[in-house]
Design a protein with these regions (language model features):
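Extracytoplasmic ligand-binding site segments that recognize negatively charged/polar headgroups
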Residues: 47-54, 91-92, 96-239
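Conserved C-terminal helix/tail region of periplasmic/extracytoplasmic solute-binding proteins
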Residues: 335-365
Length: 365
């Protein structure tokens, strides 16, 4: 199911990115491409999260361009990163990854700088989409969807005590203790404490992260669970009254219970992005660029909004889909400017090991 995209993420990124940093980097310049290439003579293998694109996407792309497309699935960023960094040709032409992972791939010379002359639909993107810290100007990646993390809660069960701060989640009022969940994936496990303490979501400072750990350990006794997969269901049933949640996932709960609401805490949050990249080893780079350009079409991107309930940084797609959704799912109306007030997640490099160690120590039984 499509929502397994984030749920399956694990703390394996730490060791992986540490290994990546130790590898030697190759030239990351773009390969010269032929704008008149016969795309019917090229084939594409694309790796994406399951159910994260329309089922008929390969057939429609082949009908338009003559290029046969095979879409394979990965469950996590870590899974596809392991495949792409194993050495040799992975056989993948285009991969969908989160922004900070694209940054790591680019640093190791494993993905192409994009030829923007072949991606005219970049013009559909909001200007804010070119201002993200992991890839300013979208030099080597093109955004597919974006969002933020906040508190998803049952307004009917918290009347008069609606959360406004990360501290409301970490140190809830006595009547809500044991009815709160936090995300287990390490970057998002750290986020509430980082923001509550006034730190960056990308901090690599050991002293700051020590304070983050102390706050998370203190908060642990207030939790029902660390939960990446069923937190919105817990809200629906009333088992939980307040959970840390990705905005799109909160929408899955809202779809089942209109008493569920979403708020970005006053201390701020993150801005996460899923992107498309072209592998250096691809022998079908013109078709790969055509595929990315096709994905940025209004109708393809509006499918993401309508079916995944995530925002996309695509102006005509949001203009097409938002009016019918924003009434039921108010967080879909968070503007690009509002999103950009939050921190874009970046690759932590060697500091990933620090995050992994703290996550392990905090969540250990």
């Amino acid at each position: 199911m499509r929502i397994s995209r984030k749920a399956a993420a694990t703390t394996a990124i730490a060791g992986l990115l540490l290994a990546l940093t130790a590898c030697s980097s190759s030239d990351s310049g773009a390969t010269a491409l032929d704008p008149n290439a016969d795309l019917s003579k090229q084939t594409l293998t694309v790796s994406n999260w399951a159910a994260y694109n329309p089922d008929d996407l390969p057939a429609k792309f082949e009908e338009k361009f003559g290029t046969k497309v095979t879409i394979t699935n990965h469950a996590t960023n870590e899974e596809i990163m392991a495949k792409l960094t194993a050495g040799g040709d992975s056989g993948i032409d285009v991969a969908f990854v989160s922004g900070q992972f694209a940054q790591a791939l680019s640093a190791q010379g494993l993905i192409e700088d994009l030829d923007k002359t072949l991606i005219s639909n970049e013009a559909n993107l909001y200007p804010e989409a070119a201002k993200l810290a992991y890839d300013p100007g979208n030099k080597y990646s093109m955004p597919y969807s974006w969002g933020t993390t906040g508190i998803c809660y049952r307004a009917d069960l918290m009347k008069g005590n609606e959360p406004t701060s990360w501290n409301d989640l970490l140190m809830p009022k006595p009547q809500y203790k044991g009815k709160v969940t936090m995300l287990a994936t390490e970057r998002w496990l750290m986020l509430p404490a980082q923001k509550a303490l006034g730190f960056s979501a990308n901090t690599q400072d050991e002293a700051e992260m020590g304070k983050v750990k102390d706050l998370l350990v203190k908060a642990k006794s207030n939790l029902l669970a660390y939960d990446d997969t069923t937190f919105y269901e817990r809200l629906v049933t009333g088992e939980a009254v307040m959970v840390e949640a990705w905005d799109g996932w909160c929408n899955y709960g809202i779809a089942k219970n209109k008493n569920i609401k979403f708020v970005v805490p006053k201390e701020g949050s993150d801005l996460f992005t899923d992107v498309m990249v072209v592998l250096k080893t691809s022998k079908n780079k013109e078709a790969a660029h055509a595929f990315i350009n096709y994905i940025l079409d209004k109708d393809v991107q509006s499918w993401v909004v309508d079916n995944i309930l995530y925002k996309v940084p695509n102006i005509p797609a949001m203009e097409k889909s938002l009016p019918a959704l924003v009434g039921d799912f108010p967080n879909m109306g968070i503007t690009p400017a509002e999103l950009l007030k939050n921190e874009s997640l970046v690759d932590l490099g060697k500091a990933s090991a620090l995050y992994t160690r703290i996550a392990t120590e905090v969540t250990a039984k």
